């Protein structure tokens, strides 16, 4: 067990030396294309999305409303919260609420009645400016008052729920306050709702609200504050160890920085749409991984090259059991390229031997799509280093679990009469069974 762990730790260091930084948009497109099963359209779409929002920007995916794939770029800050009542819409044809030069009230608590915000509402009526109210919740009594005044034409107003929950909601509200130059009203902030005046209001150049989402475009007057906030969030991102938390912090940075790219996946049928969404999701994850840790030429060829480093690592081990663990890793690293070759209908051992004879050519490898040996970096057959690293680390983690388990229950597959065994399966002739 410890032999496998030590071997993989050393191989990860070797992998980092073999990795190349993603330098061009074409490299990103190639990574996405390979991960999407060779779909060049998906690769180009993801490459274009990253070109618009930057390498560290946020690219999301959603179901499109047409049969064609589309790339939509949203300026400003967008989040998944829509208007609380359809009576707030200003454009009945498109069912959206849209205001320019809008004031924003940010409340980190529930608004129970209109009396809670009477001072703010009176200021909006006197100033004749549109008002967006963003709160944890606007309860029925307060909502009814706002709707009646909107329908009468007394107030240009719209209310939405604040994005997020708990601490994350408070952070989002702070982000919006910094973008718009406002102040968050709440007990924890030291500003009570009853005493709040128009001094706490933020300003947006434009707001667009649909049934499902809200977009706020700042007026640019708070650029310095936004830059400082982004720097602060980046520091938090560097300190956290959780991938989910890091991803959410990255989303906040992208929203504050002024843009999110949305890939709208289109298809003719529901079945095609599900399959296509999985391909796009895989391609997006692979592209992010490539930006994070670089790329290597062909994952199978890279693993085979790493297998040649194992003997050096093994010689530094004194424990025979650890050396056995290193041997297991070496044999395992040879399997992927054989399986790739077999799936392409060629002899895996022949392909492996050809690559092994050219270890001095770091980018040389087998392209299963064209059944040829070539420079994989030049032809775009590249894989994210992070994917290769995680595959090794996760494989060892699973193997450790099996070694420590008393018993493993699995389904016994019946081999049909006359069926040929998998030539790269553990226990096949020439591959030292027992792995």
Curated annotation (Swiss-Prot):
Q: Where in the cell is it found?
A: Plastid, Chloroplast
Q: What does this protein do?
A: This protein binds RuBisCO small and large subunits and is implicated in the assembly of the enzyme oligomer.
Q: Which GO terms describe its biological process?
A: protein refolding
Q: What is this protein called?
A: RuBisCO large subunit-binding protein subunit beta-1
- What factors induce this protein? By heat shock.
Q: What is the lineage of its organism?
A: Eukaryota, Viridiplantae, Chlorophyta, core chlorophytes, Chlorophyceae
GO molecular function per UniProt: ATP binding; ATP-dependent protein folding chaperone
Say which species the protein is native to: Chlamydomonas reinhardtii (Chlamydomonas smithii)
Give the quaternary structure.
Oligomer of probably six alpha and six beta subunits.
> What coarse category fits the chief subcellular location reported for this protein?
plastid
